[in-house]
Structures are given as C-alpha cells and as structure tokens.
C-alpha cells in the first residue's frame, strides 16, 4: 500500500519504519524544518530514536499535501494537543473515504472530545480509525515484540489496517469500541503521572500496585458511563497500556511524575523530559469528564 505519515516524532517514525518493513511505500510529513533536514540527511532521528535507521526509500517532506494525495491511508502521529490544528491543515487534501489512523492519545481540554472526534469534525469526509495499546516507540523501532489494537467504525477498515500493520513482531487485534480504546489511552497517562509522583516520593512497589489497580477501576467506571465496553478497559488498550506506562522508564508521563514527586514544578518537569507530556493535558479533561458524568475519580 501507499501510505502517508503525518508527524515525524518517535512514534510516527517507528510506525513508518514498521510499515516500510512490511513492504509498503511511505512518505512522512513534518512541520519542523530542522527535523526534516535531520531525517533527510542523517536518516536517523538523533534526538528521539538514536541508532534507528530510516530507509532511504521513505520520502521526508515539509509539504503536507505530498503525504496525503493519492495515499491508501494516512497515519496521524502528531502529539494530541496539535491534533485539531493538523487535521485542519490536512482537510483540503483528504479524499472522500480516505482512511486516517490516529495513533496519539489524549482528550481535548476545551471540548472534552476524543482525538478521532476532533479529526472527524475537521475532516468529515475521512474514515477515521485508531491504533492504541502498550507500545513504546523505542521498542517498536528496535523490533521488540508488541501487541496493539486497531479500532474502526467498520470491520472492513479494521481488517484492511490489521493486515498492513501486522508483522512477525507487531501483533494487531481489532475492535469496534473506538471510544473505549481512546479513553483508556488518554486516561492512563494521568494515572502514569500519579504513579511517577509516587515513585519520586519513594513510596515503593505496594503503593504503585494499588495505584495501577485502582486507576484502571476509575478509568473503566468513567469509560463505561460514557459508552465504552468493560472488556476494552481490561484489555491491551486499558490495563495493558496502563502497566507499560506506569512501569517503564520510556514513559514520559512517568518520568515527569517522578520529577514532580521529587519536588519539581510541573513546568520544570516538562522542560526536563523534552517531550510533550500528554497526561498533563488529559488530567484537566479527565477531571471535567468526571464532573460531567458524576463519577468519583480520587486518583485522577
């Protein structure tokens, strides 16, 4: 297939490499001229994925239409706070029924919308799907075994995408519960921030296990009230993603939490992590959702 990637950070780059290894054609767009130059010249994302080679066959571009026009499907991999703005830019070039797979995780603070909801609002002609699960980019790029879930409105779209992403080391399940998948992915970042704070304060493993377990209960309670399914929250995109995010040093949310637990301010922690800490944005949205749906969320 011929694929367009939008966003050339660690996750966008890892997925491009995976899709290229699966014998697809690929063009990646970035908004950042310095990033485009580095990827084109060095064929490596020196800051975010050092040591991972990006094939010469993958086209790197600063022109958004080059990554959209005539592509079989698009992978939207920009950090969640930039989802809507990027979707606006994409809209004029997206064809009727063109598939967009969103791979970021978050909830919009102002509207409380999921990312797929924002994309659909800006690009009504698109067929929007999501990819989520316990999947640190650093490990996917190094071909370590990973399992994820594709959520789509139709089984046909889900199966089409499953076939293209699936590899010997990247296993893909499918689901129709897009809402549950997206809520699990966004809300677990908030719990990971809390787990990091507990680590930073030296609270130990018992406290962390309690946080993770009670955290998934809060996520599931709110998610089911909003229309998600229980099995989604107890699966890869719920408990699976929560475990990896709370336990791994790859997790920027956990790293930021540790720094806050050690006494740094939110701003200092985000500065030190050098990446977008999505849990910070999602925490405010999660609180507002709790109020809206009358759910008690003590950890969040």
Descriptions of predicted regions:
Residues 82, 93, 118-126, 145-193, ...:
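Internal alpha-helical scaffold of NAD(P)-dependent oxidoreductase catalytic cores
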Residues 188, 195-199, 224-234, 242-300:
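NAD(P)-dependent Rossmann-like dehydrogenase/reductase catalytic/cofactor-binding core
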Residues 1-52, 59-62, 89:
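NAD(P)+-binding Rossmann beta1-loop-alpha1 motif at the extreme N-terminus of oxidoreductases
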Residues 9, 13, 33, 61, ...:
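Electropositive phosphate-/nucleotide-binding environments in soluble metabolic enzymes
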Residues 54, 60-69, 73-145, 161:
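Rossmann-like NAD(P)(H) cofactor-binding subdomain of soluble oxidoreductases
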Residues 3, 25-26, 126-128, 172:
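Hydrophobic anchor at the start of a short beta-strand
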């Amino acid at each position: 297939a011929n694929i367009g990637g939008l966003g050339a950070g660690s996750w966008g780059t890892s997925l491009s490499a995976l899709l290229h290894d699966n014998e697809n054609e690929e063009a990646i767009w970035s908004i950042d001229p310095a990033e485009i130059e580095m990827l084109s010249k060095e064929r490596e994302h020196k800051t975010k994925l050092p040591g991972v080679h990006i094939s010469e066959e993958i086209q790197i571009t600063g022109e958004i239409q080059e990554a959209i026009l005539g592509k079989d499907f698009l992978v939207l991999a920009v950090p969640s706070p930039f989802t809507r703005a990027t979707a606006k830019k994409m809209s004029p070039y997206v064809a009727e029924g063109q598939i967009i797979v969103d791979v970021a995780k978050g909830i919009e603070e102002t509207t409380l919308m999921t990312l797929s909801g924002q994309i659909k609002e800006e690009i009504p002609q698109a067929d929007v799907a999501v990819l989520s699960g316990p999947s640190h980019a650093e490990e996917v790029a190094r071909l370590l075994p990973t399992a994820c879930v594709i959520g789509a409105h139709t089984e046909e779209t889900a199966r089409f995408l499953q076939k293209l992403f699936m590899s010997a080391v990247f296993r893909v399940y499918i689901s129709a519960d897009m809402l549950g998948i997206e809520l699990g992915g966004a809300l677990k970042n908030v719990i990971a921030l809390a787990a990091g704070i507990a680590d930073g304060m030296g609270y130990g493993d018992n406290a962390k296990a309690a946080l993770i377990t009670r955290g998934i209960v809060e996520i599931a309670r709110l998610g089911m009230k909003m229309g998600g399914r229980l099995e989604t929250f107890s699966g890869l995109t719920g408990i699976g993603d929560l475990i990896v995010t709370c336990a791994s040093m790859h997790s920027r949310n956990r790293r930021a939490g540790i720094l806050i637990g050690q006494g740094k301010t939110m701003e200092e922690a985000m500065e030190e992590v050098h990446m977008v800490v999505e849990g910070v944005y999602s925490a405010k949205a999660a609180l507002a959702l709790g109020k809206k749906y009358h759910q008690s969320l003590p950890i969040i």
